[in-house]
């Protein structure tokens, strides 16, 4: 059987952003960013109006339908927890009558499926509806599907619990930050301060075209974190990098050793005798730089958008004390993250055994 035999494949749409009334409704409209680490989706960052639905003819995704990203980021999968809508980068897999196929089984099947003919690039990959329709699929009895789902749910449950531990540690670090420094947006403890433009100089990295990309050992950082591994690097040592472009632009992290920084991210230069790296990273994330992004279809932050942002400057000794406490938390996070990798490897092995 092919996917075309089993599924009534459908894509979503994006209403015109030039008509503000299209974006003032309460209908859930899912983009790839809304699918991050969520098996069931019932909400979205953006919503659309009934007027937009009528004007575009966008089809509703019924509750229980499985859907998957197939452009830019292939293979993010979720199940609709309520009736909703999606954009055109997401394929929907309504099951045709006559096929006993569990949505939960299909969820794992799509996560584990190796897509033929996917055009994988440095910063993303693409499929199309024709390629998806031509893929072959087979599945066992509904009872065997449930047994497989139960096993894989057990492993994903372990991963979810460990991710919850990571979130708790993040909350602890954030609590320590507020305890020591107050609210940096209001400078509630009246620390000395200066403007962003007087503290930081931002410089974007270097473009990395698909034809120049060679898989290697060095992480490639783009607007949303690591996007791949290259055989060359353009940065070494300790750096603060800030995502410049994309749904998660404004994310801040400390990166050490050798890596490639693309032009979708900034390297933040500053005087390390005035600001500690880990304090500065935590401060900038607490200030939520994403709120200063423009509102184009592809969000972007810039030097000009951040230049007047207030940056608190506590004594460097206090900053370093905070960093020592945070580094201890980061070590705990690293141990948990490594255990998550182990469980994910086991999950991947089991999915390969069932779906390859």
Predicted features and spans:
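A short beta-sheet element
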Residues: 31-32, 49-111, 222-285, 294-307
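Non-catalytic DNA-recognition/assembly elements of restriction-modification systems
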Residues: 1-13, 25, 134-149, 157, ...
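Short, solvent-exposed loop/turn positions at domain surfaces
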Residues: 16-17, 55, 121, 160, ...
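Glycine/small-residue-rich phosphate/adenosyl-binding loop
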Residues: 289
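DNA target-recognition patches
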Residues: 4-9, 16-52, 192-249
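Hydrophobic pocket-lining residues within nucleotide cofactor-binding pockets
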Residues: 35, 132, 306
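Extended, charge-rich, solvent-exposed interface segments
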Residues: 123-124, 128
